[in-house]
Every structure is written in structure tokens, then in C-alpha cells.
């Protein structure tokens, strides 16, 4: 199966697009693909528990349900270190999440290692 990278820059200010990115990632896992997600800009805030537990998109579902399915399916999360620092997202926010902070060169490397890339 394919390796899919989903690059997300929309955060809580655009819940429908944010949830859509996670729905697409979940759908790829459901189809048997390997998925990585790179969150940058406002999207890094999606990893906060309060946001995960409460965000729902119009017609794109609940963020928590999609997130849990991605984690269960072996998905990996990368958060822009600079975006996270600027928005106060810390190691504590990522404590129980399969995620790591990453710099732009990691996004470039991931884009080359994956077969397809979706951007939201």
C-alpha cells in the first residue's frame, strides 16, 4: 500500500477543514495505507486535549474520533517546532501522543519519502 503524508495548516479557527484533514488520514489508514501528518501554523493547536475533545467539522466529523483511529492505525504526527513555540504548544501537550516536534527540513524529507501528499 501507499505512504500518505497529510500536511495541515488549518487549526481550530477552521474546524471543518481541520477535521477534514484528519478524516482523509483516517480514511487512508482504513484502506491499509501508512499515514504521517505534519501540522504547522495554527494546526499545531489541534493536538491540545481541549481542542481534540471538542472540535467538530461541518460534515467532516469529530476530531477526537478521527485522531484516535489514526493513532490506532499506526499514524505518526509531526508538529512544526516553530509554530508550536509561537502558539505555546509544549512537550506536555504531546505527552501521550505519538508525535514529535520537527523543523521544515523534516517536512521536505517526509514529502520525498511518501508516495502522495495532501494539504489542508
Question: How would you name each of these model-derived features?
Answer:
Residues 5-19, 51:
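Short, glycine-rich nucleotide/cofactor-binding loops
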Residues 18-31, 37:
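Histidine-anchored nucleotide/phosphate-binding helix
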Residues 25, 35-40, 77-81:
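Short internal beta-strands
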Residues 29, 71, 111-112:
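Anion (oxyanion) recognition and catalysis
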Residues 43-57:
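N-terminal beta-loop-helix "entrance" segment that forms/cooperates
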Residues 53-58, 94-98:
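Short, flexible loop segments at the rims of nucleotide/cofactor-binding pockets, characterized by
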Residues 54-81:
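A glycine-rich helix N-cap at a beta->alpha junction
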Residues 86-119:
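C-terminal structural segments of small proteins and small subunits
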Amino acid at each position: 500500500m501507499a505512504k500518505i503524508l497529510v500536511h495541515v495548516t488549518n487549526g481550530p479557527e477552521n474546524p471543518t477543514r481541520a477535521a477534514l484533514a484528519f478524516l482523509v488520514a483516517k480514511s487512508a489508514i482504513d484502506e491499509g495505507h501508512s499515514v504521517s501528518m505534519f501540522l504547522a501554523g495554527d494546526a499545531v493547536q489541534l493536538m491540545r486535549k481541549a481542542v481534540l475533545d471538542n472540535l467538530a467539522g461541518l460534515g467532516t466529523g469529530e476530531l477526537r474520533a478521527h485522531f484516535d483511529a489514526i493513532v490506532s492505525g499506526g499514524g505518526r504526527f509531526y508538529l512544526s517546532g516553530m509554530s508550536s513555540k509561537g502558539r505555546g504548544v509544549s512537550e506536555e501537550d504531546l505527552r501521550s501522543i505519538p508525535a514529535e516536534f520537527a523543523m521544515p527540513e523534516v517536512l521536505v524529507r517526509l514529502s520525498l519519502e511518501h508516495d502522495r501528499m495532501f494539504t489542508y
